[in-house]
């Protein structure tokens, strides 16, 4: 073998037990999937920052890449938010060519973000992609940032549901939401509303009314960790009316029957969900008992 060749030889047993020499490409590229957190640079983990610093190529949705400063010798590959699998395939191709790639998401890359798209593309892609070293670095997702700002609303059992029907039918969304409401989870709603989907949050909150008291605390947490951060603690009844004020930067959190608020003079109330739970009057297969 030419000593300058980028290929190396490995030996495997074939099905008959014979020894056969095979050639496999040397792996020089890598792919790291990171989350930048919800906003402030202080919430980017050191591991995620190190991956960004080491990358030759950054791949992601344009607004997320805009949060990363330009640097000589590093290339940004921006794309639209509706081409996640195509974006992931592009990142894998770059890594296969020997580039050190960071796929950039907001929040946590494994929560309604790019990590799943990368593995979907990997499974469907060519076999040579399987030798690419892939690392997923965790990040702070929006529901954790919002919960920290409010107090401890996720102190009990909770779940997260995306209201977007871009990747799944709306009847799947409503079926999951209905089950979560009937089980009395605290429910974190991602992607609550967009220009193309202006009605879905209102529909979700109307559904919640069938399973929760009107005074149930609901958080509207917008752009947490950014200069335009806004956190509102509403009742469920108020939230139904305010649904149109949310946008894609808003995380909506519907409390459980046990979720409480602590009023404060001149400041937003604290919201928390106790860890201890007695039998809930709301947990039925049909909603209210």
Q: What spans do the regions from the language model cover?
A:
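Class I SAM-dependent methyltransferase SAM-binding "motif I" and its flanking Rossmann-like core
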Residues: 23, 111-183
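A cross-taxon signal for low-complexity, glycine/charged-rich
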Residues: 1-4, 10-18, 24
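A polyampholytic, Gly/Pro-enriched intrinsically disordered region
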Residues: 99-104, 152-163, 181-185, 237-248
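Class I S-adenosyl-L-methionine
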Residues: 21-134, 140, 279-286
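A contiguous loop/helix-start segment that scaffolds small-molecule binding in enzyme catalytic cores
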Residues: 21, 31, 182-289
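Short beta-strand segments
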Residues: 34-35, 103-106, 137, 161-164, ...
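Short, solvent-exposed amphipathic alpha-helical segments in soluble enzyme
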Residues: 47-51, 69-70, 118-121, 151, ...
